[in-house]
Amino acid sequence: TITVYNPWKPGEIYDTYYLVKNEGQAVPTDGLKVVIPLKSIMTNSATHLGFLELLGELDKVTGVCNSNYIYNPTILQGVKDGTIKDLGDAFNLDIENLLLLHPQAVMTSAYNAEDENSRRMKQTGLPILYNIEWQEKSILGRAEWIKFIGAFFDKEKLADSIFSQIAEQYN
């Protein structure tokens, strides 16, 4: 179980994820069931790509936003080849093409407590994973979100190891 807390309303839960390896596994109704490891993901923030690269999961990216702000050569080649779809502006996502893409999950950076774009994405019925690392007050706090991403790919140990290396180098 992963719980993301609302950075704009301390103590309030933003979303809860129940990670399962079997689609038929029952989970509580107060959160979202996500079958892991993810096989495809769309992300609306270039910052998520660095984490995915460190985890060896760039090949799971099927959609991005604002590819003109992305400098990862693997992702840019995918956009050029058409294997990765650019869904436009992260603040005004192309919902129709998101539905056509149908990734297993959408990783998004919520931009405020009542994010209209997130509300529109939720209406698609696709699992929305809120990665709000940009709200962390410290660089290590931001880096620690690799553990969040790693969990969705069943790579918690690798994510912990990567974070430990980052923390050691930083300190």
Where does each model-flagged region fall?
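Aromatic-residue detector
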Residues: 1, 15-20, 32, 145, ...
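A short, structured surface patch at a secondary-structure boundary
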Residues: 6-99, 105-111
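Extracytoplasmic substrate-binding proteins
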Residues: 83, 96, 100-109, 113-171
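Extreme N-terminal leader/targeting regions
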Residues: 1-12, 116-121
